[in-house]
């Protein structure tokens, strides 16, 4: 079971975007994730008349290491670690380490 999943609210804990919050858009194996609004790059795109692209400078989100992000805990309003807890009827579920609240309710 993966600790970080698509749709999780995360906070960057290291790197040039330290302190920024965003939502996970994509999880790329083995240890990269794309977070909305974090690690933005400018790409110079060539026009393509077949697809209808006008070209120009396009800003896009680029992948960031999983080790540089932590899940955001709304109860404590801080970055938190993820643990696993066994729940009857559901099996293993993710939880916050600080207050043992379930993430996937």
Curated annotation (Swiss-Prot):
<dbReference type="GO" id="GO:0003735">
    <property type="term" value="F:structural constituent of ribosome"/>
</dbReference>
<comment type="function">
    <text>One of two assembly initiator proteins, it binds directly to the 5'-end of the 23S rRNA, where it nucleates assembly of the 50S subunit.</text>
</comment>
<dbReference type="GO" id="GO:0019843">
    <property type="term" value="F:rRNA binding"/>
</dbReference>
<keyword id="KW-0694">RNA-binding</keyword>
<dbReference type="GO" id="GO:0005840">
    <property type="term" value="C:ribosome"/>
</dbReference>
<dbReference type="Pfam" id="PF00467">
    <property type="entry name" value="KOW"/>
</dbReference>
<comment type="similarity">
    <text>Belongs to the universal ribosomal protein uL24 family.</text>
</comment>
<keyword id="KW-0689">Ribosomal protein</keyword>
<comment type="subunit">
    <text>Part of the 50S ribosomal subunit.</text>
</comment>
<dbReference type="Pfam" id="PF17136">
    <property type="entry name" value="ribosomal_L24"/>
</dbReference>
<dbReference type="InterPro" id="IPR014722">
    <property type="entry name" value="Rib_uL2_dom2"/>
</dbReference>
<dbReference type="InterPro" id="IPR005825">
    <property type="entry name" value="Ribosomal_uL24_CS"/>
</dbReference>
<protein>
    <recommendedName>
        <fullName>Large ribosomal subunit protein uL24</fullName>
    </recommendedName>
</protein>
<keyword id="KW-0687">Ribonucleoprotein</keyword>
<dbReference type="GO" id="GO:0006412">
    <property type="term" value="P:translation"/>
</dbReference>
<comment type="function">
    <text>One of the proteins that surrounds the polypeptide exit tunnel on the outside of the subunit.</text>
</comment>
<dbReference type="InterPro" id="IPR008991">
    <property type="entry name" value="Translation_prot_SH3-like_sf"/>
</dbReference>
<dbReference type="GO" id="GO:1990904">
    <property type="term" value="C:ribonucleoprotein complex"/>
</dbReference>
<dbReference type="InterPro" id="IPR003256">
    <property type="entry name" value="Ribosomal_uL24"/>
</dbReference>
<keyword id="KW-0699">rRNA-binding</keyword>
<dbReference type="InterPro" id="IPR005824">
    <property type="entry name" value="KOW"/>
</dbReference>
<dbReference type="InterPro" id="IPR041988">
    <property type="entry name" value="Ribosomal_uL24_KOW"/>
</dbReference>
